[in-house]
Amino acid sequence: MPLEMNKDVFITCAVTGSGASQDRSPHVPRSPKQIADSAIAAARAGAAIVHCHVRDPVTGVPSRDPIMFREVTDRVRDADIDVVLNLTAGMGGDIILGPAHAPLPLANSTDMASAEERVAHVAECLPEIC
């Protein structure tokens, strides 16, 4: 018996994008309030899931700061919306080797963190998915 394809559609909005997206557009939110406001607007526009990274509010550089994740989480949950909050847990696992002839030392863009540090904000904020 063939399986019937599920035709339900769920829209996911990646609010900030990943990596260093802060200079790609002036519309990429930076502060926790801007990120939460963008997530809330996406949910009101029909997104079922909002995927959030946090950023340094001044530079826009990606951050793992649990306090900023907590602010985003609280603002989204305090809004009158029904949305699945998806906090990233993908930071801190980037090893960037040098060129093939000299792979070490690691490139400056390497971002390594312990498993505990990589998910500290998840344990604190308890999003629906990460």
Model-derived regions, located:
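N-terminal small/glycine-rich loop or linker at the start of catalytic domains
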Residues: 2-27, 90-104
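Acidic (Asp/Glu)-rich catalytic clusters
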Residues: 2-6, 43-44, 77-80, 119-128
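Hydrophobic faces of well-ordered beta-strands that scaffold small-molecule active sites
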Residues: 11-15, 50-52, 83-89, 128-130
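Glycine-rich anion/phosphate-binding loops
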Residues: 27-36, 64-71, 108-116
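Structured alpha-helical segments in the cores of large, soluble enzyme domains
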Residues: 36-45, 72, 76
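Extended substrate/RNA-proximal surfaces in nucleic-acid metabolism proteins
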Residues: 94-130
